[in-house]
Amino acid sequence: MSGGDGRGHNSGAHNTGGNINGGPTGLGGNGGASDGSGWSSENNPWGGGSGSGVHWGGGSGHGNGGGNSNSGGGSNSSVAAPMAFGFPALAAPGAGTLGISVSGEALSAAIADIFAALKGPFKFSAWGIALYGILPSEIAKDDPNMMSKIVTSLPAETVTNVQVSTLPLDQATVSVTKRVTDVVKDTRQHIAVVAGVPMSVPVVNAKPTRTPGVFHASFPGVPSLTVSTVKGLPVSTTLPRGITEDKGRTAVPAGFTFGGGSHEAVIRFPKESGQKPVYVSVTDVLTPAQVKQRQDEEKRLQQEWNDAHPVEVAERNYEQARAELNQANKDVARNQERQAKAVQVYNSRKSELDAANKTLADAKAEIKQFERFAREPMAAGHRMWQMAGLKAQRAQTDVNNKKAAFDAAAKEKSDADVALSSALERRKQKENKEKDAKAKLDKESKRNKPGKATGKGKPVNNKWLNNAGKDLGSPVPDRIANKLRDKEFKSFDDFRKKFWEEVSKDPELSKQFSRNNNDRMKVGKAPKTRTQDVSGKRTSFELHHEKPISQNGGVYDMDNISVVTPKRHIDIHRGK
């Protein structure tokens, strides 16, 4: 198949990060507090109460929070021990202002390692590492409207290369290299660190209150924020109820809807406060229904992008297969080392057991040698018989110990043999997967390689594209095929451009299109389809290979190419 005019990983995506420029798709956006998706802050009213070191006004709570404190500015805040940078804290609904405590502590080693793993470079747009999973039923079991917020803070210097404190006072945004946002995968909402695409977040100034060390701030999606700068108190790394640590933290594509429930800003403080700028991310906890909605949207956008970018999908699958093969090779090497060590220990324990058995056999032979003196306690040989018996007892104990050690070594050798066999089998599977992925990539990449147009096309009438939205679409007109046949093209994109240019030059075909579409075709762009035929951002007619290139279908064979609408193109590749 072949996509429309979109290029790059983000051509089929949309922006979901309210008021965050360069959101999930890297395209930029300026949505408000509500993005119309049902995932925005309007579904989770601001309120009071308390949580784990983060509070919405007064009250006392559980976890790391608790207590009341009134700021001179008239808002309530908690000056409890703050959560460590990079660790999530809960903020429960309540009286209208969100309170957080921040410190000057450095990143923990675990969070620093996550940042190091996201240095890139990354292919295929944004990548992320999920840190924590969210269990909404544990956070608000009875009333979904009482869902808490999840607040994560980081030193601003860890997410941006810009010296925030030196920016002009009217600077509205700052470019960041990493963000903490929500992602949805495996039917759960997660908190993740995301990197890999140009992004920017608002910069806001913290305003002092009458209480020393307490400031006010606000940013899109977070209308009222009280920030307590805590010094001299230990930070907490205990996860709040309803938040679990994700295991196997590895970098994966972040998807298209990441950040849909998160609101972020960099807060800078007055110079005299001594507090360095802090990055803050506030995430709305989604209900299970909202998570499913996001998951379905993510799948739809991913499938839409996959359909429009077969080469990139093949490359991504090959990269993944190659990474899996590399890991399989490491597993084999590790298990080979384990087996070699197990064999060495097994042979050593066997030698020790053989020696112990020989010692026991010698002791038994000595007993037999002096056995005739067993009933003659006064004879000199009786003492020799007793000594031989004592030797045999000691030898038997040694044999028992050596046998236990040998049995353990034999079990480890057996387990190591099984583990190595399994690792070798897995590697064989990964080798086959990598081979298949490479073959498919090589075939799909043909569309990026030069080629000569072939094929005769078919006669068409004045309703040429009426069938573009059904079956296999409309054929290449024979008149256009005659113009393009035997011509060399640098790539299939080059062919597509020349195809539409020739259509614009044909008097009978061009009059079937509007003036705007003719203007598009004259410069090699595909004409726009009707509204009911579009799919997301795919709004132009597309060229489809009836026999897929991955199955050796001809890239430039015009008898293998048809014109289809975006909607029909997707349905074809879904087998509909």
From Swiss-Prot:
A GO molecular-function descriptor: metal ion binding
Signal peptide location: none
Disulfide bonding pattern of the chain: none
GO cellular component terms attached to this protein's record: extrachromosomal circular DNA
Biased composition (Low complexity): 36-45
Domain of life, source organism: Bacteria
Keyword annotations: Antibiotic, Antimicrobial, Bacteriocin, Endonuclease, Hydrolase, Metal-binding, Nuclease, Plasmid, Zinc
Residue sites binding Zn(2+) per the record: H544, H569, H573
Annotated Gly residues bias: 19-35, 46-75
First-level EC class: hydrolase
One of the Pfam families matching this protein, by short name: Cloacin
Region Disordered, residue ranges: 1-75, 421-478, 506-557
Amino acid composition bias (Basic and acidic residues), ranges on this chain: 424-447, 535-548
Any one GO biological process: killing of cells of another organism
EC number, UniProt record: 3.1.-.-
Its job: This plasmid-coded bactericidal protein is an endonuclease active on both single- and double-stranded DNA but with undefined specificity.
Family of the protein in this entry: Belongs to the colicin/pyosin nuclease family.
This protein's name: Colicin-E7
